[in-house]
A protein has these predicted regions:
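P-loop NTP-binding module
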Residues: 1-171
Length: 171
């Protein structure tokens, strides 16, 4: 959880947030102390204590050391960051990670917000792996090109697979 301003992962997983990423980056503990096992089949590093200097912490050489160590241990590393358009924390990591998977909340994120996010990532030569639409209500009316279908209903399967088959996002 690299969202050290408004961390949520520890709360969602009911894990103690002490001794997390912020403490590691500040040099107060090592990787073994911050890596926590879950009953869900994955390990997690929580944010630690809330920090107003998280962008500076994420720019330290200790981030590289942590990512190197984790990449030897794990097949996949998923990093939760604050919103890209709000603070610079996420873009500080651009040259340290393979790419970004943007989480877009249905009914909350505007097309302009998404465009600005993509633009911000392009400015730092970041690779965008895809866009994930979350909090979708399958009973919501469909508007635009497919409005004649009405509610998702029997077309639900189509929409569930839409993002998987659509290789290029257009806006």
């Amino acid at each position: 959880d690299a969202d050290m301003r408004r961390p949520r992962i520890a709360r969602y997983l009911n894990i103690d947030k002490q001794d997390g990423l912020s403490e590691y980056l500040a040099g107060l503990c090592d990787n073994a102390e911050i890596t926590k096992n879950t009953d869900l089949g994955f390990d997690v590093i929580v944010s630690g204590n809330v920090s107003s200097s998280s962008a500076e912490l994420l720019a330290t050489p200790r981030v590289d050391a942590l990512f190197d160590e984790c990449s030897r241990e794990y097949d996949y590393i998923i990093i939760d960051t604050p919103p890209i358009n709000v603070v610079t924390d996420a873009t500080v990591l651009a040259d340290k990670i393979d790419g970004y998977l943007l989480a877009v909340r249905a009914g909350f994120s505007s097309v302009d917000d998404i465009k600005q996010t993509v633009h911000s990532l392009e400015q730092v030569d970041a690779k965008i792996l895809g866009i994930m639409l979350e909090n979708v209500d399958p009973k919501t009316e469909i508007y635009g090109k497919y409005s004649r279908y009405g509610k998702y209903g029997k077309y639900g399967r189509y929409y569930k697979n839409y993002c998987n088959s659509y290789s290029r996002y257009k806006y």
